[in-house]
Design a protein with these regions (language model features):
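Residues that form generic nucleotide/phosphate-binding pockets
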Residues: 61, 84-87, 104, 147, ...
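C-terminal engagement/docking regions of AAA+ P-loop ATPases
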Residues: 110-180
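Canonical AAA+ ATPase core
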Residues: 1-76, 82-91, 128-130
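Secondary-structure transition/hinge residues
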Residues: 5, 52, 70, 109-110, ...
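An amphipathic alpha-helix signature
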Residues: 55, 59-63, 98, 102, ...
Length: 180
């Protein structure tokens, strides 16, 4: 899907722009659930835990009801989302920052399985988006560090149940000095 196309029964279809997938994974301790192979886990940009809403938010959710209508209001128009995605792509990354990402990935590869080129691309893309959300037009090392756990933990924990905390990210951050 990252190529902007899907195939169904041997027929290739172009995906609309903007396009992205949000997927959920059941807990591995549930019946009929098995871990995803490393190659499939690597295709997911991030693993996030949304947790539960606070009481007031859940009350608002219950009182509002559920409107499955495709005409329900959304937070962003497709055009606005596309503009934001384009702006993320244009966030400036210095050579020093790219070297920092490469250093993190290289250190991860000292142990199996290590981070793939897809992971390094995802890390930089997520850092670009984070920097935009922080109101900057360029990416700084703090942006990479902020998104690192969400981007790498599921890749380095391949086949293991989700853990609390970010042991792999913390180890990478300790092993790679952040030049400022």
């Amino acid at each position: 899907m990252a190529a902007g196309r899907v195939s169904v029964d041997g027929v290739s279809h172009a995906l609309p722009e903007p396009f992205f997938v949000i997927a959920t994974q059941n807990s591995l301790d549930q019946v009929g659930t098995s871990p995803l192979p490393e190659a499939q886990l690597d295709r997911f940009l991030m693993r996030l835990s949304l947790g539960f809403p606070d009481r007031a938010s859940e009350r608002a959710l219950l009182c509002a009801g559920f409107d499955p209508s495709p005409d329900s209001p959304s937070g962003l128009s497709p055009e606005t989302l596309q503009q934001l995605q384009d702006r993320c792509t244009n966030q400036h990354c210095s050579e020093l920052l790219i070297d920092y990402v490469l250093d993190l990935v290289e250190v991860s590869r000292a142990r199996h399985p290590g981070l793939s080129p897809r992971a390094s691309q995802g890390l930089l893309a997520a850092a670009r988006a984070w920097s935009l959300l922080q109101g900057r037009d360029h990416v700084v090392i703090d942006d990479v560090q902020a998104v690192l756990p969400a981007v790498v933990e599921h890749r380095l924990d391949a086949g293991c149940p989700a853990r609390h905390g970010s042991p792999h990210s913390e180890a990478l951050l300790q092993a790679v000095p952040a030049l400022r």
